[in-house]
Amino acid sequence: FQFNPQTLPETHYLVTEHGNARKAKRWPLNTVFVSKNHASRYGSDQYVLNGLDWESYGAVDLDNIRTRFHFLGKAAWSVKNVSGAIRVAKKAGVELDVLGGNRINFRRGFRWTLSRSIHFHGMVGGSEKTGLLNASRGMIFPVRWHEPFGLAVIESLYFGCPVFSTPYGSLPELVPETCGFLSASASEMAEAVRTNRFDPRACHAHVKQHFSVETMTRNYLTMYQRVLDGETLNAQPPVIQDPARNLPWHA
């Protein structure tokens, strides 16, 4: 992951870059990225959107009575902006499940909030994770960086959860107007959360159509064939153009 080989192999190769480089460095010519925006920030137009094996996620209950919203991500990363998600939930007057972070840090004490309307679940997976997503009204995800892709976003959409996020990185590619709301304003996002006019079935259908493991595999096979045919995917070595972090967030 994020390994940049110093000596290129003699055989045909393809490198997938999944993250945001902190410093400008040259990537191999046959590098692909995980969203159109991600590629463009490296001066490339070569990308394959991620996809997941939805059959492995178990049953989705789109008729379930849903009461809370959720945040899903590495809450300890400041760019994921869990504090912003908590602010939005409080402004909207809704309860929030935080998946991927704990309320207590033994070096820092209580983190983010003591509110009883905010529920921390730590790192979750399996049936615990899918159970929480099946009970969620939507995902609040106000990231402050250019998200390269966002597996948590498509996981949430699969379970019928509209996504309320910032318009950075890949988010406009993943979340159409029928499946969520994008804004860098906490007040605007909170109002969208309050009204929540989105259809869970539309969210579920969107990701099944566009972000399946089968679609991703076909697109990678096309890339592999181009390389095997002697094509060089990028004319110049990709180099990150915009390593921006802490993008605007109006609390």
Predicted regions, residues:
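Conserved donor-binding/catalytic core segment of Leloir-type glycosyltransferases
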Residues: 44-52, 56-99
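Nucleotide-activated donor-binding/catalytic signature segment of Leloir-type glycosyltransferases, i.e.
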Residues: 98-100, 108-131
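Short hydrophobic beta-strand element within catalytic cores of glycosyltransferases
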Residues: 162-165
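A short hydrophobic beta-strand element within the catalytic core of glycosyltransferases
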Residues: 139-141
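Conserved acidic donor-binding segment of nucleotide-sugar-dependent glycosyltransferases
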Residues: 174-187, 193-197
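Short alpha-helical segment that forms part of, or immediately flanks, the ligand-binding pocket
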Residues: 130, 153-158, 172-173
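Nucleotide-sugar-dependent
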Residues: 76-80, 144-151, 172-173
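A short, well-ordered alpha-helix in the C-terminal region of glycosyltransferases
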Residues: 198-222, 226, 233-240
